[in-house]
Every structure is written in C-alpha cells, then in structure tokens.
Curated annotation (Swiss-Prot):
Pfam families in the cross-refs: MbnB_TglH_ChrH
Listed name of the protein: UPF0276 protein CGSHiEE_05645
Family in the record: Belongs to the UPF0276 family.
Superkingdom of origin: Bacteria
InterPro entries: MbnB/TglH/ChrH (IPR007801), Xyl_isomerase-like_sf (IPR036237)
HAMAP family, per database record: UPF0276
C-alpha cells in the first residue's frame, strides 16, 4: 500500500469511525505515534490492527528529543523500528525540538537557531537514520519563546539541518502560521517561499486556539488578514496555541493552498485532531477538503511512499 493523498491521524476515540468507513473513501492513510502504540494491547490494539490492514501507515515520533543533550533513547528507537516493520511502514518523522533536560519535560521545546545547533541536531538525525535504515523527515514545531542568541530565522534553521543531515522536511502548516503570528519574525508566506521545497515530503494541518477576544474582530474584517504582500500582518489575538483541538482556520487552509502551489510534488497531507472531537463527519469533510486542494494542483506530480 502506498502512503499518498489525504490522511487523518488515528486516535482511539475514532477507532469505530475508521472501521465503519466504506472502501475507496477520502482517507487514504493514517498516522500514529510509536510512543502511544508500540506496547498498546487489548481491544484498542485489535481495532488498530484492523485499521492498519486497510490504510497505509505513517509513524510520527513525539519524544526522540532530537535537539536534546541526553543520548538518543535506544529503547524507543527499537520499539519504533519494530512497529514500522510490523505494519510495513516506510515513513517516519520527528519534531525539531527537545523534550528532556535531566528528565522528561512532557513538552516540545525549541532551541536557539544557531550553527552549533544545526550540527548537533543533524548528527542525531543521521544516527536515527542509520538505526532505522531509512531517511526520516523533520517537522517544524510551534514554539512560544524565541531565543535572543539565534543567528538565523526558523526556515533557515530548518533548511540547514535538513541539508546537513540529508533528511526530508515535514511541513506543519499550522505551526508556520502560529509562529508567524505569535512572534512576528517571519511571514508564513515568506517561510514557504524560502523552505527547501525539494525536501518537503509530508505535511500536517491542524487547528489552533485563539487566546484573545480580538479574534472576533479578525473574523469580521476582510482587510486585516495575511495577504500575499510579503511581511503584511493583521491585528491579531495576543496568542495562538497549537492545540490540535479545533477545526482548521481559513487562514491556515489558505497557507496550505499556497504551499501546494509552491511545491514541485504534492506530498501526503494529514489532518491532526487530538481532542475535543466533533462528529466524525466534520473531520471527514476536512480531509475531503485536503483531497480537493490536492486535486486542484494535480498538474504537479503526486508524491507517494511504499508503506
């Protein structure tokens, strides 16, 4: 089975809905985190096994801590490789972050955007690729504190690591938008103009939460939105939070469409939803919208992986 088209993250809350889907539906693949599923058993594992027989599987890590200082978690890597082998998955991605410092921090934290960090993360990625026996992809993360010691911007940092490690780039479109709004350092459209498009081989899209009453003002003002004039910003809520608990916002859909216009191939694209689940029909409609955008730009080559 090939990993291509539009997908939806597999969650235990959605298991019955996945299993009731008819053949040839809009959802073309699923994704799980090895930390959550490597040792899962019981009815949850039985249902997942059934879903994995129907859908190609992408594996997306949460806690390898590629930016951390502690040695890579070899047990986690072994579990990840075993999970991928069991379900014939050939795609793995991880976050550009760290989540340990003398203990597990239960969050994805940023590092300074420096040349030293580039070399550190790239070496750890090469180690992971050697262990798994495949090229992995690196995801841009949302972050809420910017280091004053950074010597490059976020997309320059991502590109430099991907080139140094010879890995793929996993674009999270919502994270690009959230960071652009929260920090005001890099217009999301400029990010997409500057990212190494030849390395982009996977995309996430998700919803975010707006932490300010000004959100209503934004919704009602057509001339206060991001536009294609690079560097133009709108009046915005004080803080956007990458929650994966809301429907995808229109501004993020616009950014995904712009990404498809920029990319030489249309990568597999997954909708993330982690809590606050709506009726499954609403999630399915969002996946259908991804598929429609992919079809709109189908003049470019469609990217796929054997999975």
């Amino acid at each position: 089975m090939k990993l291509q088209g539009a997908g939806l993250g597999y969650r235990r809350n959605l298991a019955e809905d996945f299993l009731q889907l008819p053949p040839n539906n809009a959802i073309q693949f699923i994704e799980v985190a090895p930390e959550n599923w490597s040792k899962m058993g019981g009815m949850a594992r039985y249902q997942f096994d059934q879903a994995a027989e129907r859908f190609p599987l992408a594996v997306h890590g949460l806690s390898l801590s590629l930016g951390g200082q502690a040695p890579l978690d070899r047990k986690l890597l072994r579990n990840t490789k075993a999970l991928m082998n069991q379900y014939n998955s050939s795609f793995f991605s991880e976050h550009l972050s760290y989540c340990e410092c003398e203990g597990h921090l239960y969050d994805l934290l940023p590092m300074p955007f420096t040349e030293e960090a580039v070399k550190h993360v790239a070496q750890r990625i090469r180690d992971v690729q050697d262990f798994l026996g495949l090229q992995i992809s690196l995801e841009n993360t949302s972050y809420y504190l910017h280091s004053p010691t950074s010597t490059m911007n976020e997309v320059e940092f991502l590109n430099a690591i991907a080139q140094e490690a010879n890995c793929g780039i996993h674009l999270d479109v919502n994270n690009i938008y959230v960071n652009g709004v929260n920090h005001g350092l890099l217009d999301p459209y400029v990010f997409l103009d500057q990212v190494d498009v030849k390395r982009v081989n996977y995309i996430h899209i998700a919803g975010h939460d707006e932490e300010h009453s000004a959100a209503q003002v934004v919704e009602n003002s057509a001339d206060e939105s991001f536009n294609k004039v690079k560097g133009a910003y709108r009046h915005l809520p004080e803080l956007l939070i990458d929650t994966h608990g809301e429907a995808v916002k229109g501004t993020v859909w616009d950014l995904l469409e712009y990404a498809y216009q920029r990319l030489p191939t249309i990568p597999p694209t997954l909708l993330e939803r982690d809590f606050n689940f709506p009726p499954f029909a609403e999630l399915y409609a969002e996946v259908e919208h991804i598929a429609q955008l992919q079809q709109k730009y189908a003049h470019t080559e469609v990217m796929s992986y054997a999975a």
